């Protein structure tokens, strides 16, 4: 099955999901915050439009298109959009 991120305009929409993986397309507007949370899965965040402050526990990164963030399970993190932004979040159970 083929998906295009152009087809997704909602804030967060799962575009693929099975027992071991979830792929989510995420739109966040400038100044919007996604509060601190964690997950039991490994996470890869790929930003392809905009600019986001990504906070991982006590570290803060500004991410832009071309940047990739990788997180191990259980790591608390949050996001704040500097500009309107689009990201792909891939959560995988690597056990």
List where the protein language model places each region.
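Glycine- and acidic-residue-biased ligand/ion/polar-headgroup-sensing regions
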Residues: 41-52
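Ligand-binding loop in jelly-roll beta-barrel domains
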Residues: 73-95
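Short acidic-glycine-tyrosine-enriched beta hairpin
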Residues: 57-73
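Short beta-strand segments in beta-sandwich/barrel cores
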Residues: 24, 33-34, 50-55
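A cytosolic small-molecule/anion-sensing beta-strand core signal
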Residues: 48-49, 64-65, 83
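A short glycine-rich, His/Asp/Glu-containing loop-to-beta-strand
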Residues: 2-32, 90
């Amino acid at each position: 099955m083929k998906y295009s991120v152009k087809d997704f305009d909602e804030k967060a929409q799962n575009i693929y999901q099975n027992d071991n993986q979830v792929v989510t397309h995420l739109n966040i507007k400038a100044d919007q915050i996604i509060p601190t949370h964690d997950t039991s899965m490994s996470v890869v965040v790929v930003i392809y439009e905009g600019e986001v402050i990504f906070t991982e526990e006590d570290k803060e990164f500004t991410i832009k298109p071309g940047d990739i963030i990788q997180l191990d399970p259980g790591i608390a993190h949050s996001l704040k959009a500097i500009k309107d932004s689009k990201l792909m979040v891939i959560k995988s159970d690597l056990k």
